[in-house]
Amino acid sequence: VYGVALGVSVSYIFIFVLLGSLLDRCGAGNYMMQVSFALLGHLRGGPAKVAVVSSAVNGIVSASSVANVVTGGIFTIPLMKKAGYGGVRAGAIETASSVNGQIMPPVMGAAAFLMIEYVGIPYTDIIKHALLPASISYVALFYIVHLEALKLGIMPMMSAGAPKTPLQKLAGWGMGIAGTLVVMGLVYWIGIGVRAVAGGAATPILLVLLLVLSVWLLRISARHPDLPTDINVTNPVRPESWPTVRSGLYYLIPIGILVWCLAVDQLSAGLSAFWAVMAMLFQMVTQ
C-alpha cells in the first residue's frame, strides 16, 4: 500500500518520534540539560560545552535537530552570549551540535531506517557503525568550542557548592565512571544469567526485576528536589553534580530497554522502540 519512504515512516519513524516526544514531555530533555550543566558548567567556555554535550545526549533520546534546538538552544544560546561567545558563534555552535544529534545512536534520523529497507542492513549494524563517527564529531566540536573559549578569554561560571581541589574532582569523576561501568556490567550479566538459568520463564522474571529497579530509582529520585524547568540565564549558577544526576536516573530505563532489545535480544527496531514506549508510559503513570 505504502511506498518505501512512507512505509518506513509508518513502521519505524513514528514509534521512535513517539518515544522521543514522551521522554521530552516527561522531563528527560530538561534532565539531560541540567546534568550537562552541572557536570560541565565549571569548565572554561562551559555554556558552549554544555550545548555540545546536551545536544549529544538529547540526540540519544530524540534524534531530531529541531527538537534539539528548541529544548536546549533557548537556554544555551543566551548563556553562550552572556559568557562572551557572541550571537553568531553561539548560534553556529548550537546548530552544529543539534544537527549531529541525528547520527547519534540508538535513536537516529530517518536515513537510518531508509537504509534498513533499501540496503537490508540490520539496525544493530547501523548503530555499531554510526557510534564511532558520531562520537568523533562531538569530540571535535567539544575541542573547537574549547579553542574558541581560549581565544576569547572566557572564564568558568560560578558553582553552587564550595570549590573542589583537582584531586577531589578527579576522584569524583573516577568514582562516577567506575560506578557507571559496574552497574552496566551487573545489569548485563544479571540479564544473561537469568536467561541462561530460567529459560522460558526468563521474561517474566526480568520484568519483575525491571519493575523493582524502576521503583528503586524512583525512590532515589524522590529524595531529591525537582529540577528547575529552565536555567537562570541572567544569573547562571552551576548546581551540584551528584544530586542533579540522581534526581532523574529513572529516565535512563526506557533508553536502556531500547538498547537491550536492539543489541542483546536482537529484536527489530520497531519492536524495540515499542517496548521502550511501554516503559516510558509506565513511568509517566507512576511519576
Where do the language-model regions lie?
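Hydrophobic transmembrane alpha-helices that form the pore/transport pathway of multi-pass ion
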Residues: 33-101, 107-114, 120
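Helix-boundary and loop/linker segments of multi-pass membrane transporters
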Residues: 2-7, 44, 244-248
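Long, contiguous bundles of hydrophobic transmembrane helices that form the permeation core
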Residues: 128-287
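Transmembrane alpha-helical segments of multi-pass membrane transport proteins and ion-pumping complexes
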Residues: 13, 17, 21-26, 30, ...
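Helix-coil boundary and interhelical linker segments in multi-pass alpha-helical membrane proteins
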Residues: 116-132
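Core transmembrane alpha-helical segments of multi-pass membrane transporters/permeases
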Residues: 1-30, 264, 269-276
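Flexible loop linkers connecting adjacent transmembrane helices
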Residues: 30-40, 75-76, 122, 152-161, ...
